[in-house]
Amino acid sequence: MTDPDLHQNDPENPAQASEPVVSKPYIMPDDPETGSAEAYAKEAAEARDKMLRTLAEMENLRKRTAREVADARMYGITGFARDVLDIADNLQRALDAVPAETRANADAGLKSLIEGVELTERSLLNTLEKNGVKKFDPTGQKFDPNFQQAMYEVPDPSVPSGTVVQVVQAGFMIGERVLRPALVGVSKGGAKAAPAASNDQSNSAA
């Protein structure tokens, strides 16, 4: 009796041979479609625009940071500089307290003392200026409330009205800012003062 399982496992049985598997062609999921060149060109242009915007923002940030650092260096000493001005004022008051006649007739000791005070004042002002703090004297200029504070009026028809004719206390700038306005006396009674050509008080340092 013939076992049917033997014929099924017979390698020479042509019915057992499997049919060949035909693979389908592989298609890339991102294969470009017809007419997509314009879309890619648009995407490239948008990417370039974003890159340029990012670079511009980075450059603006760099400039802003540099400016903030410079301001911090310049104006970080504002409080200290304002306190030091009291010392400069006291030195100036000490010199102003000595009459010109006394100076002319002073002995060697007093002259040496006066010269020492003058040297100290100059050294202090030079140190302040090295750190961006500059003294200004607006005498003869048109009164400007941005840089000066009027303490009183001086009747004087010989000069244009609104002209600074006396300085009670010198002003100081720190960088481009007013550290302390000058205390001044302003003329009254003359012709109206002409507009100032420039309000840059730092150019009138004493």
From Swiss-Prot:
InterPro entries to which the protein is assigned, alphabetical: GrpE (IPR000740), GrpE_coiled_coil (IPR013805), GrpE_head (IPR009012)
Pfam families referenced in this protein's UniProt entry, alphabetically: GrpE
Comp. bias regions, Basic and acidic residues: 1-10
Keyword Cytoplasm in record: yes
Chain intervals for the UniProt region annotation (Disordered): 1-38
Localization of this protein: Cytoplasm
Origin: domain of life: Bacteria
GO biological process: protein folding
GO molecular function annotations of the record: adenyl-nucleotide exchange factor activity; protein homodimerization activity; protein-folding chaperone binding; unfolded protein binding
Transmembrane segments: none
SUPFAM superfamilies to which the protein is assigned, alphabetical: Coiled-coil domain of nucleotide exchange factor GrpE, Head domain of nucleotide exchange factor GrpE
Gene Ontology CC terms: cytoplasm
Keyword Chaperone in annotation: yes
Keyword line: Chaperone, Cytoplasm, Stress response
Subunit-structure text: Homodimer.
Function text: Participates actively in the response to hyperosmotic and heat shock by preventing the aggregation of stress-denatured proteins, in association with DnaK and GrpE. It is the nucleotide exchange factor for DnaK and may function as a thermosensor. Unfolded proteins bind initially to DnaJ; upon interaction with the DnaJ-bound protein, DnaK hydrolyzes its bound ATP, resulting in the formation of a stable complex. GrpE releases ADP from DnaK; ATP binding to DnaK triggers the release of the substrate protein, thus completing the reaction cycle.
Stored PANTHER family: GRPE PROTEIN, GRPE PROTEIN HOMOLOG, MITOCHONDRIAL
Similarity field: Belongs to the GrpE family.
Annotated HAMAP family: GrpE (MF_01151)
Protein name: Protein GrpE
Biological classification of the source: Bacteria, Pseudomonadati, Pseudomonadota, Alphaproteobacteria, Hyphomicrobiales
Encoding gene per record: grpE
